[in-house]
């Protein structure tokens, strides 16, 4: 993300996301309509345009590895990349994964209050609009710790989801007496995806426009 003379450029490769938080109407600190604007599009392999390019280059998109759709060489188990654009993945680039960024731009004004840049661990736990609402609420209390609070909220949501997954697996692996059919099922570990976020609070004065 780059801001030059109040013009914002969001430059993205991968599945991190950049979201702008706006408030229209109300005063500077509360009220008004809260709006989220996605300043990037997640570059997932299942996106129609990304999938088409990958297939034209001899790659395929499938779920050979359980979970998210990934990019593979045909009839192969590599590279198994869960994004359609990346930097430095040589094998993936041979089968249509691109290193070319997508660029979005916007002229900032006094309605624009903050920009959130986050890894997919944020957006898999909360929607863009949920994140914007959360930040607006927390920034009224303490801007300095907003990013930490957002990361903690997302981590908590991942942990709750993993508890439900564990409970479900134990239920389907239990016999009628409550004994585990698969002794290893109760020891399944569920990952929490990378949770990284940066919040940039914008200070554009009305008299600048």
Where are these regions (language model features)?
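PP2C/PPM-type serine/threonine phosphatase catalytic core
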Residues: 1-209
């Amino acid at each position: 993300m780059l801001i030059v003379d109040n013009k914002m450029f969001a430059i993205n490769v991968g599945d991190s996301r950049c979201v702008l938080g706006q408030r229209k109407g109300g005063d500077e600190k509360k009220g008004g309509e809260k709006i989220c604007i996605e300043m990037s599009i997640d570059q997932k392999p299942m996106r129609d345009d990304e999938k088409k390019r990958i297939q034209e280059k001899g790659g395929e998109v499938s779920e050979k590895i359980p979970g998210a759709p990934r990019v593979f060489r045909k009839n192969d188990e590599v590279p198994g990349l869960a994004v359609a654009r990346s930097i430095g993945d040589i094998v993936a680039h041979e089968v249509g994964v691109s290193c070319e960024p997508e660029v979005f731009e916007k002229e900032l004004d006094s309605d624009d209050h903050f920009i959130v840049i986050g890894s997919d661990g944020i957006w898999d736990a909360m929607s863009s609009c949920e994140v914007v609402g959360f930040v607006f609420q927390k920034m009224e209390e303490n801007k300095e710790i907003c990013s930490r609070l957002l990361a903690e909220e997302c981590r908590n949501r991942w942990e709750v989801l993993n508890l439900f997954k564990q409970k479900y697996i134990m239920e389907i692996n239990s016999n009628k007496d409550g004994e585990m059919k698969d002794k290893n099922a109760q020891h399944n570990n569920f990952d929490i995806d990378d949770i990284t976020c940066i919040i940039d609070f914008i200070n554009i004065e009305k008299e600048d426009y």
